[in-house]
Amino acid sequence: MEALTDLKAYLPTTKKELQLRGWDELDVIIFSGDAYIDHPAFGAAVIGRVLEHAGYKVAIVPQPDWRGDHRDFTKLGKPRLFFAITAGSMDSMVNHYTAAKRLRSDDAYTPEGKAGMRPDYCTITYSNILRELYPDSLIVIGGIEASMRRLTHYDYWSNTLKPSILVDSKADVLVYGMGEKQVVEIADAVDRCAVDRCAVDRVAVDRVAVDRCAVDRPEGLKIAALEEIPQIAYMVDGVELSRSGVEWSRSGVELSSSGVEGSSNVQHYSTPTQSLLNTTQPQTILLRSHEEAVKSKRVHAENFRVIETESNKINAATIVQPVGKQYVVVNPPYPTMTTEELDAIYDLPFMYHPHPKYKDKHIPAYEMIRFSVCMHRGCFGGCSFCTISAHQGKQIASRSEESILRQISVLKDLPEWKGYLSDLGGPSANMYGMHGKDMALCEKCARPSCLFPKICNNLNQDFAPLLNIYKRVDALPYVKKSFVGSGVRYDLMSEAYGRELIVNHVSGRLKVAPEHTASNVLQIMRKPSWEQYERFYRFYEKVNKEAGLKQQLIPYFISSHPGCTNQDMKQLADQCKQMHYRPEQVQDFTPTPMTLATTMFYTGLNPYTMEEVYVAKTKEEKQKQNSFFFFWRAPKAEKADRCAERPRRRR
């Protein structure tokens, strides 16, 4: 397919490709820890295409060499507007290390799966290099790594509580969540300032005449030009925050020149009894400082409770956290994307292929998703260990049927197309099109999960839109079979949907995630009961038998999750023995930034009750729990049984 090798069809990555387009200067340069794959499953490509569609000249520098003379950081020059940085589709530390902190030998987002093509703490490394090379340039960071480190967070790999990544990265603006709207607004704001030649923040003494076009360096970004943009974070000193309080009608914050003082609308939360539920009016919340959180694990747990509660609201508050002599300001998110907005992103001219520079090199992550279709964003499952709701949001944004069919029409023209779709899914495959029956009730809600501890009565559990998509896709003459490769929630299942899924959309194995069998652990995980899994298992076996199929149900399990003891792991092993399972899809818990489970791992406290939670922290403790998965290997099984008999240790 000749078009796949046309360099002008992709976002440029080299000086030569700029010349092919006749460009002398770029507006935005994106640095990514991943290889450049021009596909909507990869964030750098999406952000680049969105900016391109908005009329900006954009280039991507994938996996630059950070070790040598930094020529990869200078080869395209200085952009007119800003540098954009993402570590890639994964946090670079999760990408590099196992739960046991062993270095991984491969990287799915790199040609030939080669490890070592991005640094540890990738966002910080790239940003510091660019700050040194271009001290007066605007730097915007985003992606999952930056997003989940926007406030004080526990870093498992250094075993420390770190401040907002804005501190160590020296970046100016952090875009959290899915960043399409933010980057365009940032580009538009900086572009206006560049055109107007605004260089200094001019605020009249009476605070009436305000020049909003302030983006100068090197003293630091004068954030006035950008401060109203939703879903970003930035740092200011006390004086700048005071000005922001006067200008922000939504927050009503008023500060003295020395810092945050005397505001009746700033809410300070220090005890678990002060609820953030049932409020529809945005406000500003002042967290306890980073320094206080470092000194007290209880303070960090309290801060997290506030952060997670706000992230689950439709009308969230502005969050402010003191760090040293400055303040991190996190603006509330945009409203959930409409179907039309999401469709517009997927209609951009993606090539659905790696950049031609990689030639025929194998990129594992691309091979996995090249014939998959993401039908929606967001997840209302609220699992304790998961980052999806904090990154993509709890509300579901769904694409239209026509948008999905248009993407499949493009995929069929790829040379490798054989007629099979590997996945019609999303973060949780069976949440497509779901929302509250009465959105006014949703606006008053801050539940972390619409499914736990039981399914919300206000949730519209209508599977008709999803079943209709399956029907239309399977009717396409160039589609032989469409599968659901994403995980499904077995606690969100009608009989009609379950039968359609099992009979027509399983490629021999269906992935589900009970995660554990012990009820006390499942409660902490915010997962349904093991009995509910067993009911689904029986239903799955029944439907397979009726249809003459022999498909497997593959459960995912986690060891050493906060709250899990050796005895709980023995119970899991015993349950698997009874069901003749030999667990395959198993993992040891990895604490990742900004999740409830990670907060419990670090503090030993449940942030919502302040009760102590048992945590297996040491390498030996984690290995012991993991060994229970391998009960069918005799030597390990005997050792695991001995471990279970030992008294548990509290932290």
Predicted regions located by residue number:
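Conserved SAM/AdoMet-binding glycine-rich loop
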Residues: I30, V46, W66, S409-I554, ...
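Flexible glycine/acidic-rich beta-alpha junction loops that bind and position SAM and/or redox cofactors
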Residues: D91-A100, M148-R150, E180-E185, Q395, ...
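N-terminal pre-triad scaffold of radical SAM enzymes
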Residues: F31-Y36, K359-T387, Y420, T590
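Conserved, mostly hydrophobic/aromatic
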Residues: D172, I345, C379, C383, ...
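Conserved alpha-helical substructure of the radical SAM core
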Residues: Q392-W417
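Flexible, glycine-rich loop/tail regions that form catalytic "lids" or insertion modules at the edges
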Residues: V28-S32, T74, I229-I232, Q274-S275, ...
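Glycine-rich beta-alpha loop elements in corrinoid/cobalamin-binding modules
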Residues: A35, G43, P62-D196, D206-W248, ...
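N-terminal [4Fe-4S]-dependent radical SAM core
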Residues: E2-E25, A35, R298, E302-S372
